[in-house]
Amino acid sequence: MSGWRYLICVSFLLTILLELTYQGPPVPASSSTKLLMTSYSMRSTVVSRYAHTLVTSVLFNPHAEAHEAIFDLDLPHLAFISNFTMTINNKVYIAEVKEKHQAKKIYEEAHQQGKTAAHVGIRDRESEKFRISTSLAAGTEVTFSLAYEELLQRHQGQYQLVVSLRPGQLVKRLSIEVTVSERTGISYVHIPPLRTGRLRTNAHASEVDSPPSTRIERGETCVRITYCPTLQDQSSISGSGIMADFLVQYDVVMEDIIGDVQIYDDYFIHYFAPRGLPPMEKNVVFVIDVSSSMFGTKMEQTKTAMNVILSDLQANDYFNIISFSDTVNVWKAGGSIQATIQNVHSAKDYLHCMEADGWTDVNSALLAAASVLNHSNQEPGRGPSVGRIPLIIFLTDGEPTAGVTTPSVILSNVRQALGHRVSLFSLAFGDDADFTLLRRLSLENRGIARRIYEDTDAALQLKGLYEEISMPLLADVRLNYLGGLVGASPWAVFPNYFGGSELVVAGQVQPGKQELGIHLAARGPKDQLLVAHHSEGATNNSQKAFGCPGEPAPNVAHFIRRLWAYVTIGELLDAHFQARDTTTRHLLAAKVLNLSLEYNFVTPLTSLVMVQPKQASEETRRQTSTSAGPDTIMPSSSSRHGLGVSTAQPALVPKVISPKSRPVKPKFYLSSTTTASTKKMLSSKELEPLGESPHTLSMPTYPKAKIPAQQDSGTLAQPTLRTKPTILVPSNSGTLLPLKPGSLSHQNPDILPTNSRTQVPPVKPGIPASPKADTVKCVTPLHSKPGAPSHPQLGALTSQAPKGLPQSRPGVSTLQVPKYPLHTRPRVPAPKTRNNMPHLGPGILLSKTPKILLSLKPSAPPHQISTSISLSKPETPNPHMPQTPLPPRPDRPRPPLPESLSTFPNTISSSTGPSSTTTTSVLGEPLPMPFTPTLPPGRFWHQYDLLPGPQRTRQVLGPSRPGVPTMSLLNSSRPTPEGSPPNLPILLPSSILPEAISLLLLPEELELLSESMVESKFVESLNPPAFYTFLTPDEDGSPNWDGNSEEILGGAGGSMESQGSSVGLAKGTLPSIFTFSSSVDGDPHFVIQIPHSEEKICFTLNGHPGDLLQLIEDPKAGLHVSGKLLGAPPRPGHKDQTRTYFQIITVTTDKPRAYTITISRSSISLRGEGTLRLSWDQPALLKRPQLELYVAAAARLTLRLGPYLEFLVLRHRYRHPSTLQLPHLGFYVANGSGLSPSARGLIGQFQHADIRLVTGPMGPCLRRHHGPDVPVILGKRLLKDSPRLLPRWASCWLVKRSHVELLLGHPYLSYVL
């Protein structure tokens, strides 16, 4: 017993000692260089469903040398970034929103000047990741502040705000504050536990408790939630910090059937979500893909979800099931049947018997579903179909591979068959589904398209999406707005309104109108007509607004105005996606750009640009280089190998990354749950061309806003980088106050925030800001006293010093904001509206993208100055350059370097060229005259080019008038040299380059392809594989090589050891565009690139005719590649040496799809979902799930297996063959990153091999892990780096024939199958 007492006493003393000495979270050994996060705060203000979130992170570098400071945040996928600031060394740097090409231009100039810069694209994913890193000097602090805005969607009866809480470490001051203000009142609010994953669960919200340290304070129209976890609370979740989502779920009171209408400052928002309506009956047809790609887990998950869905059908509903592959099977051919218990049980038995096999015939399946619905409506004796809503739920995991496969034909057939009477809801299961086609199908037929991610919760995803549309309450909803709207038709129509969702309409009323009438007409159950009328008066700013008691009311007008812009941009992007001609897409894109610049939103057409002075970079660089040892190799600031952050060079590297668990194809279009059925598609004839004349594009520029002189009171006229050093300070006024040096928040913790009456403008006018975490009082009562910290009155401006700040405190400055925005942005004029031009109806949002009242009138400010930019006619394409495009490469993970996104200029006019001009769009696409729904062929790959052609040197035509910058068009962008800055032209008048740059956030390219172009043209990939080594091509020469390598080599086989061959490269031969990681071609000659090196190994294998060689064997990746040898006549005088070529290459894959591709000298065959034969003489493109096969130029076959494996097979033929030459095949590994470390084979073993080139006692040798040294000699070899370019002499480490087996590690026979 005494021993136990002793242990207890020791444990107790140790516990006390740990409590007394505890100063922060335990730092693991691996994170010894991690910076200390002193504060992390998130503040969300929700006003009428529109949320503004500000995230602030403060990092301190306690180390003696500079270290990388990283700020990353998961953003909601429908959110727009509206502001970003960074404070380093007491200086605040404010990001600006620029047109994306202009931002790229700034990036180029800054990069060329040695300033740090980076850029990245936005992708439409379930969540976006914003990431930025910078080198932080020792003993300094950096403050990151990011603001974004979003409209909360109503799903299944509630709104949900998701805040990503991932600081990456334990933080002493960690806080979240969420304020929700709703005019009609809040009926329900719940805070579920922190969500550590995105997988769905069956747990109901009411069954779980809120996280500890959560405080909820409710008022009639306001709710405030605070979450301030202590270090112990954080440690109980994770020892390395919280990595979860904080959720707020709530619903509002909606008593009026017409909904909630709010009018502020000539902008209105209408929320339509009536309660208490009886559900309508529905006739639903489930169309389920049962092709071979659905085999296994996906089919089981589909059956599980369908069993639950069938059980949830109402007794009065009618339903049917169609399964399809390359054949279509209708469960009840006579039509839909009633959902009785017996019929549902019979349907489940039918589901149980479904098996996956065959190809995918999308067209026939949807036409069969249309036929079933039409037959059910016409069939007598099946009960009245009056008032029954026809729905099709279409589930597929692939793309059309059987029957009609042309997208435009499928769209036309389905559109005609459904007759705009049936709502089609498409579910894209997995990454291989053609989501673009499915989305078009749904949007054109009164529905939406959603993704189902291949996760363990796929069945719950299917069930959840069905629940959203399982209860139709109204059909053909028509909302008329009486009282005068601006630039839009006074009505909006929706196909359906489903229970638990919400329709949102945003628009502008005529100036001075004080009342807006709303008339509702819709169909209810049994086709009963529902009619209602409501009149809403405009709200004056002097009237009492809703909000939390005892606090200043939120500036609702400010939120409504920004909400209108958010909704409008989303609707314009949606309309852009649906537009069928290029001109309309250009005009819609121009309007998106105008609004994005005006409201400071980062959208697919704008970018975020931040400037960091060069002096700051040099200071950090000097400090770092000083801390480095004398023997340390420091990278140069002008290194061409990228913008990665190191201890020698400060850099900001923002990234937008999505979780790998739920990959989605890169699109940034916003989808909507319901589309306005009467919305009319704009055509080129209905919209005016850009500019004042059909040959020019008029682009306005703005003069810089004048900066008032600094006031005596100490206020700063404008927060520019030239002012005195400032830092962000917490304030309950909702602003970021610039302070003078020395007034740091951690040095002066007693700085008092402004009180509730203080109104201080935000740094960015028009953008609501929020205080830092320091000001969040987790115990502050809802009814606070005057003078206590409270919410800001957002958007209010003042030129006086805040009363809440003590005047006696020195060094505190306030901010005075001019009338116009600090950084006036150029606007692209939208076409003016004519009286006879049709308007789009008021848009509505149901659950996704809102439908808005589109206005085609420009809203340029009075100080706008127009400039005209003209372009010369695009030059005539080279007749030697073929014109058939290559399909785009599959999406691969983007490397951290921004060069993979860069492109080269396209057609730049010559000073001596024709004087005619071509109109261009804001996206760099020329608008041909007359306007046609096509794009110039320069945007696409050429027919006989597996790789993009060389860039030709051109000159830029001078400006048409003094002071106007020139423009250039984008070419089919080919990859740029690794590490080099992109060479993009500016497409809008560029502003003066700021003093420095560090952040450039660029969105994904917004393609403007017409529907027909999407089918026949393939835009080049902007994601070149990381292993490509890009070189700058010569200016002369012609890449017209026909693939006859041995003609170039000067004889059959082309001895690789003959350095002194008299046959050299022809004059003008271009260097390579990329280097293959490994290849085998010729005798056969093997060329292997040493991993992580630029060096190559060359060797020849003495094979035997008829042998089947194992080239790649990777069971883990499910890949097997073999080659069969063909005998060839020996060289004169070398009859003892056998010569062989490859005559057949066989590629077999069983993961994730089972395919066998056999390539011979005469044909190509594919076995998978059936057998298909292709001819070398017929160019062909074949796309299957996880497979792309492209035959081009009768000599090249590109084979892609998923995103990480790509091979090239060349067929060599000779016009005038000698007795030594035979037709044969060559095999090249273009992308082998998908091979596992366990890969074997003559080529596969080298992909991840631990092999190095060293200098031994006997000279250079190759050293492999646990292997003998292999002697090599440095020679030259004619290497073929590109399928369309001539071979070139290149250095190669030659392995003698007698040492080849020593290099391989096994005898030759071990590789013979």
Swiss-Prot record:
Residues 283-469 form the VWFA domain. The keyword Secreted applies. Residues 876-888 have a biased composition (Pro residues). The keyword Transmembrane does not apply. Residues 623-640, 864-875 have a biased composition (Polar residues). Its main location: secreted. Glycans are attached at residues 83, 374, 540, 594, 971, 1231. One of its GO terms (biological process) is hyaluronan metabolic process. Residues 907-921 have a biased composition (Low complexity). Belongs to the ITIH family. This is Inter-alpha-trypsin inhibitor heavy chain H6. It comes from Homo sapiens. The lineage of its organism: Eukaryota, Metazoa, Chordata, Craniata, Vertebrata. The gene is ITIH6.
